Amino acid sequence: HIAGGSSVYEIINQYSALNTDENSNMPARDRRFDVTLLINGLPMIHIELKNKQHSYMDGFRQIKKYIGEGKFTGIFSAVQMFVISNGVNTKYFSAASDTELNEKFVSGWLDQENNPVSDYIDFAKSVLSIPQAHEMIARYTVLDKDAKRLILLRPYQIHAIEAVREASKNGKSGFIWHTTGSGKTLTSYKTTRNLLMDIPSIDKAIFLIDRKDLDTQTTMAFQAYANNDLIDVCLLYTSPSPRD
């Protein structure tokens, strides 16, 4: 039960994506997808597989080409997450246009002890089983309105948020330790958002900022994330310096 209801999960493979662009100057070319995971009838996670003699990045380049050819349109425009693997190396990244897909956003999976999960079977068990696959889409994606892009959280962010959620359910407190450039603002937003959505007894969350220069930056980021979400972000108070 994700997002308050029952869901139906399906897997399709070798789907034929036909060429439908009549205005294209390129020769008509049909494509065959490897594996697609459907949630409630909608394709949400697409997987491209290569053999061990090829780089997993061949899958990235193939997906980018398919997007440029218009193959991920119609119902396949619902795809949120791509997975690429050559069996021994497996990565994931969020959906985007072909011009915006960037190799730097390709991420591997890590377990809770920070050990890499590279084998495609182990990755499937950790990330693509149910309910994990649905949670990746429902809990750990963010649509950034200002940047106009979909963001998939990285493993360390997801594990931290899950730890906070489990602690909160048991009436405990805690903190998330992050370094500069690790996505602290995004992690803070998703931690707050998931607590509000998952635990009925939590009605409101207060986010404290101890540096004035981060005030506007954080507020704008939270509002950009929340614009297409189910929570509201309000700027309530700006406290004077304790010395005042």
Go through the PLM ranges and name each one:
Residues 237-244:
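Conserved small/polar residues in nucleotide/adenosyl-binding loops
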Residues 1-209, 213-229:
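ATP-dependent helicase/translocase motor core
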